[in-house]
Amino acid sequence: MQKYTSEARQLLALAIPVILAQVAQTAMGFVDTVMAGGYSATDMAAVAIGTSIWLPAILFGHGLLLALTPVIAQLNGSGRRERIAHQVRQGFWLAGFVSVLVMIVLWNAGYIIRSMHNIDPALADKAVGYLRALLWGAPGYLFFQVARNQCEGLAKTKPGMVMGFLGLLVNIPVNYIFIYGHFGMPELGGIGCGVATAAVYWVMFIAMLSYIKHARSMRDIRNETGFGKPDSVVMKRLIQLGLPIALALFFEVTLFAVVALLVSPLGIVDVAGHQIALNFSSLMFVLPMSLAAAVTIRVGYRLGQGSTLDAQTAARTGLGVGICMAVVTAIFTVTLRKHIALLYNDNPEVVALAAQLMLLAAVYQISDSIQVIGSGILRGYKDTRSIFFITFTAYWVLGLPSGYILALTDLVVDRMGPAGFWMGFIIGLTSAAVLMMLRMRYLQRQPSAIILQRAAR
């Protein structure tokens, strides 16, 4: 029992800074929305539309680079720290290549925006302008993620938290300058949010790079003189590990976007109730997601040390802590669901629907916690391909079709409206949780030599 208690302490010590970093990131989005809304409703809508395109594109790159964390954790655990700098350098090359692709997609996103049904031309122009300003921050964001993944792979999660709050502090005044046109800068409205956010990502990257160069704990991990050329072998391995994670993230984000589109014709009350429940659930999701990042680090580190039993302990402890957290957040959601809904809106119909959907959200929080921590465990074992297949099957083959049938057809029961899609979420997330656990058990039952050989690749 003592080893599980000790492991839980180490996991929470890693996870809490990640949680706070995510809070800072969420707050940046909130600040952008509020400050753009203070300028005009059109500018706020433009930022919302632009963000809905930015997120899937940038999260694809973010997911691709997540492969660095278990790689670095495993090298750190095995005492091969001299190889870490080369892996990080190739991560920067990969981030550079992906940045170019993301920037091309975002530059041409106007075709997608202007093809939206009945969109106001002025709104479309502002959304395109916002994206074309923001896209210059894509390299800064992805380079920052490489540096952050280096720190987290070395079990240093606090720098990411500090840089997150630094970004938030810089974002507010820079937003003010570019939205309203102060200190000789042009008055850009919502487009100014894009300029500010792009600048903030570069500030965060430069600050993180400065930390890495001066941190005593990383003195033995220094990039070689010059930047070196791309190493096709290392980059291919990073892509093999990261691409399934990137695709899984992309399919998860697009699933919720598709559901939002399917709910939109049902009416204002249904859309508002669905959005409130989804927004609150996203806030609760920060807890298991951060714990999953910590579990990846611990499992990778233990496998690097050559101890498959300690890796199992880290995995089981992470699941136990995650389930306990989910039970607490589920009880909190059920107990205070009406009060939470009132924080968003005071329309009685909207509040009633949001409170009903939050009951379903409370049910799926446990499944959601298990599946996301399970994904973190599999990343630690470098078994990322299975994450993609499980996510795609659970969300798009089981969850979305069942949600569509329950919400919009009479095939099984009378049309349930938004609640049907939330039942689909429960089916999809529970399926993902079961499949993740089955895959984890299969991996852990393999001979230690095979597990360690996979981890060392």
UniProtKB/Swiss-Prot annotation:
It comes from the Bacteria. Coiled coil: none annotated. Its main location: membrane. It is found in: Cell inner membrane. Keywords: Antiport, Cell inner membrane, Cell membrane, Ion transport, Membrane, Sodium, Sodium transport, Transmembrane, Transmembrane helix, Transport. One of its GO terms (biological process) is xenobiotic transmembrane transport. Pfam families: MatE. GO terms for cellular component: plasma membrane. The chain crosses the membrane at residues 11-31, 53-73, 93-113, 127-147, 160-180, 188-208, 243-263, 276-296, 314-334, 350-370, 387-407, 418-438. It is a multi-pass membrane protein. GO terms for molecular function: antiporter activity; xenobiotic transmembrane transporter activity. PANTHER family: FMN_FAD EXPORTER YEEO-RELATED, MULTIDRUG RESISTANCE PROTEIN NORM-RELATED. Belongs to the multi antimicrobial extrusion (MATE) (TC 2.A.66.1) family. MdtK subfamily. Multidrug efflux pump that functions probably as a Na(+)/drug antiporter. This is Multidrug resistance protein MdtK. The gene is mdtK.
